[in-house]
Amino acid sequence: MAAATMALSSPVMARAAPSTSSALFGEARITMRKTAAKPKPAASSGSPWYGADRVLYLGPLSGEPPSYLTGEFPGDYGWDTAGLSADPETFAKNRELEVIHSRWAMLGALGCVFPELLARNGVKFGEAVWFKAGSQIFSEGGLDYLGNPSLIHAQSILAIWAVQVVLMGAVEGYRIAGGPLGEVVDPLYPGGAFDPLGLADDPEAFAELKVKEIKNGRLAMFSMFGFFVQAIVTGKGPLENLADHLADPVNNNAWAYATNFVPGK
C-alpha cells in the first residue's frame, strides 16, 4: 500500500472542466474586489495539456469528450462519466474545492512521510508516526512539538482547534477577498504575496505548473486516503508498511489485510 507517490507526473484520470469565467466563483466574491484586471490565458497554443488537442484520459483510446470539456482548465482530460462538470456553477465550486484540498493533501502527505523518514535514518525527535504523534495531545502529559518541551507544549485539543480556526480563517479570508485591497482577480491563484518566488510571472510556465499541481494534488489525496486506511488496519506508518510489503509482498498487501481485517481488533 505504498501510497506516497505524489511526485509522479503521469496523467491521472480526473473530473474535467467546462469553460467558465471568474465570475462563476460567486457574486459575493466578485463584489469584494475593487479592480478586475483581465486574467491571463491558461496556456499558449500548442500545449499538450490544454485545448482540443490536449492529452485525454486514455490517450488514443479515449472517446470523444463531452462538449462542455474544452480543455480550458488544468487537469481536464476529457473524462466526466458522472456529469459533474456539466453545470458551470457547480463545476466552479468543485474546482476550487479540489485545488484547495489538493494543496492541503500535498502538505499532509509530506508531513506524514518526512518525520518517519528522518526517524528511520537516526534522527530523534519523539514519536515519528503521524497519527501516533497527533494522538499524544490526549495523553496526560500532552504533546511536545518535535519531542522538545521547550518548543511548543500543547495540552488542549480545543485550544489547538481555536488557534487553527483563527489563523487559517484569516489566511483564507485574505485569499478569498483578493488581498487587503481586493485587487486579486482569481482567488485560486492570487499571486502577489502568495507567490514570493514569482513562479507565475511567465504565463506558459505558470500554466504548466498548474497542471503539475493538480496532478500531484490528486495523487496526494489518494495517498492521504491510503494513509488513513493503513493507520486503521495495520496501526503502522506509511514507510513501515512499505518496508513490510517489500520484505514480504505475498503476506503484506492490501488483499491480505482486507481478507483478515476485523474492526476493533
From Swiss-Prot:
- An example Pfam family from this entry, by short name, is Chloroa_b-bind
Q: Which GO terms describe its biological process?
A: photosynthesis; photosynthesis, light harvesting in photosystem I; response to light stimulus
> Which of this chain's residues are annotated to bind chlorophyll b 3?
S156, E172
Q: Which GO terms describe its cellular component?
A: chloroplast thylakoid membrane; photosystem I; photosystem II
Q: Where does chlorophyll a 3 bind?
A: Q136, L146, E213
Please report the record's description of how this protein sits within the membrane: Multi-pass membrane protein
Q: Which domain of life is it from?
A: Eukaryota
Q: Name one GO molecular function term.
A: metal ion binding
Name the residues that bind chlorophyll b 4.
Q164, R175
Q: Where does chlorophyll a 2 bind?
A: H101
Keywords attached to this Swiss-Prot or TrEMBL record, sorted alphabetically, are:
Acetylation, Chlorophyll, Chloroplast, Chromophore, Magnesium, Membrane, Metal-binding, Phosphoprotein, Photosynthesis, Photosystem I, Photosystem II, Plastid, Thylakoid, Transit peptide, Transmembrane, Transmembrane helix
Function comment: The light-harvesting complex (LHC) functions as a light receptor, it captures and delivers excitation energy to photosystems with which it is closely associated.
SUBUNIT field:
The LHC complex consists of chlorophyll a-b binding proteins.
- Fill in the domain comment: The N-terminus of the protein extends into the stroma where it is involved with adhesion of granal membranes and post-translational modifications; both are believed to mediate the distribution of excitation energy between photosystems I and II.
Q: What is this protein called?
A: Chlorophyll a-b binding protein 1, chloroplastic
**Natural source organism:** Oryza sativa subsp. japonica (Rice)
**Organism lineage string:** Eukaryota, Viridiplantae, Streptophyta, Embryophyta, Tracheophyta
